[in-house]
UniProtKB/Swiss-Prot annotation:
<dbReference type="Pfam" id="PF04289">
    <property type="entry name" value="DUF447_N"/>
</dbReference>
<protein>
    <recommendedName>
        <fullName>Uncharacterized protein MJ1453</fullName>
    </recommendedName>
</protein>
<dbReference type="InterPro" id="IPR007386">
    <property type="entry name" value="DUF447_N"/>
</dbReference>
<comment type="similarity">
    <text>To M.thermoautotrophicum MTH863.</text>
</comment>
<dbReference type="InterPro" id="IPR012349">
    <property type="entry name" value="Split_barrel_FMN-bd"/>
</dbReference>
<dbReference type="Pfam" id="PF20766">
    <property type="entry name" value="DUF447_C"/>
</dbReference>
<dbReference type="InterPro" id="IPR049288">
    <property type="entry name" value="DUF447_C"/>
</dbReference>
<dbReference type="InterPro" id="IPR016733">
    <property type="entry name" value="UCP018747"/>
</dbReference>
């Protein structure tokens, strides 16, 4: 099962966060990082990172920029908005060239071993349908906005139609912040 989280890294005193789908397996985590992303570049050389289990809206925010309220455990950044953060040491990096409908890309398959967990006192909010739709828009946005990913026109049209459909539902059922984040992504893609 893929779990949607926010991964945080630090390199040259700069914090980075990215929404990433990860696989949890006992005390280990596995993630696939695409060449060209800041997280990929950071974890080529950095050996520590955190996986932040956060509200869905924080996953969408993470696709837009790195600004956030960071806390630190042994200089490893994690998010103040997390329900909990898990800290990992990289134990393996594998590199593969992958070709799919998004084109050719270099992929780092990274495995980390858990070294610490911190639970924060953030109380979960009730789930809203806009939460899941906003995460889906963020996933599609991350692909459409990445200049390293080549998408054929038919797939691109389908993705844009999906974003518009999800946005129409968010406008009906979501809160102000859901709508604002979705609007930013649509504007960045010149869809508004």
């Amino acid at each position: 099962m893929i779990s949607e989280v926010v991964v945080t890294t630090r390199k040259n005193n700069r914090d980075n966060k990215a929404p990433i789908g990860v696989y949890f397996k006992d005390k280990k985590v596995i993630m696939h990082l695409f060449s060209g992303s800041h997280t990929y570049e950071n974890l080529l050389t950095e050996d520590y990172f955190s996986v932040n289990v956060v509200p869905p809206i924080e996953i969408a925010k993470a696709v837009l920029d790195d600004e956030d309220d960071y806390l630190y455990y042994n200089d490893i950044p994690y998010l103040k908005s997390s329900y909990y953060a898990i800290f990992y040491k990289v134990i393996e990096r594998k590199f593969v060239d992958r070709e799919d409908k998004f084109g050719k890309n270099r992929l780092m398959i990274l495995e980390g071993e858990e070294i610490k967990r911190i639970y924060l006192n953030n109380i979960p909010k009730p789930y809203n349908r806009a939460d899941g739709l906003l995460v889906e828009i963020a996933v599609i946005y991350s692909r459409l906005a990445n200049k390293n990913i080549k998408i054929n026109e038919d797939d691109k049209k389908e993705m844009i139609n999906d974003i518009r459909k999800y946005f129409s539902i968010i406008k009906k059922v979501g809160g102000r912040e859901h709508k604002q984040l979705a609007e930013i992504m649509l504007r960045n893609l010149n869809l508004l």
